[in-house]
Amino acid sequence: MMKASYKQLWKLLVDKEMSKSDLHKATGLSSSTMTKLRRSEDVSMEALRKICTVLDCNIADIVEFEKRDN
């Protein structure tokens, strides 16, 4: 099974000098979606699209999939 990792998103925020709070406000994502991102849980394509629009990037720039150990 594959697990989403948003490490690249957090690195991109640092590069753009944005906080997670800034991202939350700019995208209008719900608090629960932001929590899912912090926990590396699955989020909707719509949420990823909003993030990419705000950060002017592609999905591959903010998320990667890693194998889960079972």
Can you describe what each PLM-predicted range is?
Residues V14, G28, R39, K67:
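Residue-level detection of the helix-turn-helix DNA-binding "recognition helix"
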Residues T33-R49:
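Amphipathic, hydrophobic secondary-structure cores in small proteins
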Residues L48-C52, I62-V63:
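Hydrophobic micro-packing sites on short alpha-helices
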Residues L13, H24, R38, C52:
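The alpha-helix within a helix-turn-helix
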Residues M1-S19:
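A short, Lys/Arg-rich alpha-helix, primarily the initiator
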Residues E17-T35:
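Short alpha-helical DNA-recognition segment
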Residues D56-N70:
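Short C-terminal boundary/hinge segments that cap the last helix of small helical domains
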